[in-house]
UniProtKB/Swiss-Prot annotation:
Function comment: Uptake of L-rhamnose across the cytoplasmic membrane with the concomitant transport of protons into the cell (symport system).
Principal subcellular localisation of the protein: membrane
Membrane topology: Multi-pass membrane protein
Family the entry assigns: Belongs to the L-rhamnose transporter (TC 2.A.7.6) family.
Stored HAMAP family: RhaT
GO cellular component, one term: plasma membrane
Protein's UniProt name: L-rhamnose-proton symporter
Protein encoded by which gene: rhaT
Native organism: Mannheimia succiniciproducens (strain KCTC 0769BP / MBEL55E)
Amino acid sequence: MGGSILLGIFWHFVGATSAACFYAPMKKVTNWSWETMWAIAGIFSWILLPWGISYWLLPDFGSYYSFFGSDILLPVFLFGAMWGIGNIGYGLTMRYLGMSMGIGIAIGITLIVGTLMTPIIQGRFGELLASTGGQMTLIGVVIAVVGVAVVSYAGLLKEKAIGVTAEEFNLKKGLALAVMCGIFSAGMSFAMSAATPMHEEAARLGVDPLYVALPSYVVIMGGGAIINLGFCIIRLITRPELSFKADMSVVKGLLISNILFSALGGIMWYFQFFFYAWGHANIPANYGFMSWMLHMSFYVLCGGIVGLLLHEWKDTGKKPTRVLCIGCLIIVLAANIVGLGMAN
């Protein structure tokens, strides 16, 4: 396995670790509605950081974006909005199916759709099936889905052991949302593929290869921001039990800490895709679609590891923990098989 591919896999792991941890500081937020917290975090993750970092990277911020026509910018933006819809659906999936079943179905679907649809649309799927390297990467994708399923099963065992159930369990509604969420969440993978001309132009302007994908986040995350912030604002306006004014009226010390914890969560959320860009830059161009598989499978892996480190599995018994470890090892195996396939 080449050093560049190993480095790419490593950076995807770092990004997934940030993704698995971003909600931890947001759990410290108190006496605020979820909508206010999510909106404040989103301002940092979807607007301030993408714009600020891109302004710093690009020699001429305005001329870079004006260089592209709507034929490039609109698909990138719409795929970002598509991902934003999936992001909202993810939370609703947890409500109706519970964490484990919801994550297992939604992540499994988005891993498959986001990874395989790109080569299918590009007409390259047959080429993958015909080559040894392509066959190995596809086997790795299948094994990764198995790993996600095993980790999700471990979570189901954990929930049963500690008596946790879904907030409003509804199998029919939950499955429909999980499928929708899985498909729409893959919009980020499609957006990255559609933004390839933006990456190439950034490289032409002298942006370091590790950073060439970051300017496209202004457009991608702009699409996601409109959906997510719009959702939060509409709920804050229309739901009588929610009040942005009341959230902003808490005592000064709590207000500052809530803003800081929300901002920290948003910053950590952004850095999952900051390092995604680094990982993507080290993956061979003809296997760029595998970045999504690595990110999503590592996200599940890191979520399991973080849970173990935080002793969330301490009182669940040996079986759930054992199944979790097996699932994590399967995901590690999948990543190695994909890496070997890309190097073949």
